[in-house]
């Protein structure tokens, strides 16, 4: 039953995004037969180091969505403090509901069933605009962000260039 409700909700969210696209990203299904796997393209936000980039990601939804959050994994190269080396995005709203066992996040910052694909992607765009280096997924990127901005910029520029070459 939950699987069917999740499927219907995801179909509705995809339909809504197609009817009313949001600036900065596009979304579609990886496979027309599987509404639980989405392909997402995010444009690097203006006036950021990621500007001009076209970054692809896979959004994977659990069968109990929206009770539990999806995972988002960049398939494009990404150098960012809040993205693991395997491309998995680490932001508060993608963390399971409840208290943070590490004490970094308030429960109110974590996943709630009111979030949508749109709110998730807007949070990722915001993450690209301003990294959180307090609890990084990529410690090396966070260290560069804090201590060696020129090297950080160089690596991000390479990611942007490579994303453009993939078009």
Swiss-Prot record:
GO MF entries: ATP binding; ubiquitin conjugating enzyme activity
Modified residues (N-acetylalanine): 2
Protein's UniProt keywords contain Transcription regulation: no
SUPFAM superfamilies per record: UBC-like
Keyword flag Glycosyltransferase: no
GO biological process: protein ubiquitination
Recorded catalytic activity of this chain's protein: S-ubiquitinyl-[E1 ubiquitin-activating enzyme]-L-cysteine + [E2 ubiquitin-conjugating enzyme]-L-cysteine = [E1 ubiquitin-activating enzyme]-L-cysteine + S-ubiquitinyl-[E2 ubiquitin-conjugating enzyme]-L-cysteine
Pfam families reported in the protein's UniProt record: UQ_con
Keywords on record: Acetylation, ATP-binding, Nucleotide-binding, Transferase, Ubl conjugation pathway
InterPro entries named in the record: Ub_conjugating_enzyme, UBQ-conjugat_E2_core, UBQ-conjugating_AS, UBQ-conjugating_enzyme/RWD
Pathway, per record: Protein modification; protein ubiquitination
Active-site residues (renumbered): 90
SMART domains: UBCc
Leader sequence segment: none
EC code(s) of this entry: 2.3.2.23
UniProt domain UBC core: residue ranges: 5-165
Recorded superkingdom: Eukaryota
Function: Accepts the ubiquitin from the E1 complex and catalyzes its covalent attachment to other proteins. Involved in the formation of multiubiquitin chains. Signal the protein for selective degradation.
Family, similarity comment: Belongs to the ubiquitin-conjugating enzyme family.
Name this polypeptide is given: Ubiquitin-conjugating enzyme E2 14
Source species: Arabidopsis thaliana
Gene name of the record: UBC14
